[in-house]
C-alpha cells in the first residue's frame, strides 16, 4: 500500500501535468499509478491540498493547485511514479561557482534540504524557492564533480 504522502505528491503531479476536469478522471489517473482510493478519500485529499477549479486556455474547467492557476504544464508526458522517483528535478545550469536547479513547483525546498544534509564537499550551501534552487559551489570543484555528487540524490541528473 502506498503512503498518503506519496498519494498527495502524485495528485499534485497529475494535476500540474495534465488537464483533469473531474474526480473520476483523477481517480483513473491515480489508478494508472497504482493508487486505489475512494472518491471520498480523493475529495478529502483535494481539500487538504486546497485544490480548486479554474478555466483552462480552451475554456474547460480543470483542477489547479493553489497559487498556480496559470500553471505551465509540462510538454513532455511523464508518469507520476517517474516524477516521484526524481524528486521533482527538471534541470541544472551552471555559471561560474553557482548552479541553478529547476524543479517542479513545491519540490525545491525539500530537495535543497536533502542536498544540505548530505554535506557534499563540492557544495557550500543552497537557497531554495518554490521551484528553483541556487547552489553555491566550492572554488576548484568541477561541474562534473557537482553532478556526480548530486546524482546520489537525483538519479536522473546526468
UniProtKB/Swiss-Prot annotation:
One of its GO terms (molecular function) is DNA-binding transcription factor activity. The keyword Cytoplasm applies. InterPro entries: Arg_repress, Arg_repress_C, Arg_repress_C_sf, Arg_repress_DNA-bd, WH-like_DNA-bd_sf, WH_DNA-bd_sf. Gene3D superfamilies: 3.30.1360.40, Winged helix-like DNA-binding domain superfamily/Winged helix DNA-binding domain. Keywords: Amino-acid biosynthesis, Arginine biosynthesis, Cytoplasm, DNA-binding, Repressor, Transcription, Transcription regulation. SUPFAM superfamilies: C-terminal domain of arginine repressor (SSF55252), Winged helix' DNA-binding domain (SSF46785). GO terms for cellular component: cytoplasm. The keyword Transcription applies. Pathway: Amino-acid biosynthesis; L-arginine biosynthesis [regulation]. It is found in: Cytoplasm. Its main location: cytoplasm. GO terms for biological process: L-arginine biosynthetic process; protein complex oligomerization; regulation of arginine biosynthetic process. Regulates arginine biosynthesis genes. Belongs to the ArgR family. This is Arginine repressor. The gene is argR.
Amino acid at each position: 500500500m502506498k503512503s498518503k504522502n506519496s498519494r498527495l505528491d502524485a495528485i499534485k503531479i497529475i494535476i500540474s501535468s495534465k488537464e483533469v476536469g473531474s474526480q473520476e478522471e483523477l481517480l483513473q489517473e491515480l489508478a494508472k499509478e497504482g493508487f486505489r482510493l475512494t472518491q471520498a478519500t480523493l475529495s478529502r485529499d483535494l481539500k487538504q491540498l486546497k485544490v480548486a477549479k479554474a478555466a483552462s486556455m480552451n475554456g474547460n474547467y480543470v483542477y489547479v493547485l493553489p497559487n498556480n492557476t496559470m500553471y505551465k504544464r509540462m510538454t513532455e508526458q511523464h508518469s507520476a511514479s517517474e516524477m516521484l522517483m526524481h524528486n521533482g528535478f527538471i534541470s541544472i545550469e551552471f555559471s561560474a561557482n553557482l548552479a541553478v536547479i529547476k524543479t517542479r513547483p513545491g519540490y525545491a525546498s525539500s530537495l535543497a534540504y536533502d542536498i544540505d544534509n548530505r554535506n557534499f564537499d563540492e557544495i557550500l550551501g543552497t537557497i531554495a524557492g518554490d521551484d528553483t534552487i541556487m547552489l553555491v559551489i566550492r572554488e576548484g570543484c568541477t561541474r562534473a564533480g557537482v553532478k556526480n555528487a548530486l546524482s546520489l540524490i537525483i538519479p536522473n541528473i546526468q
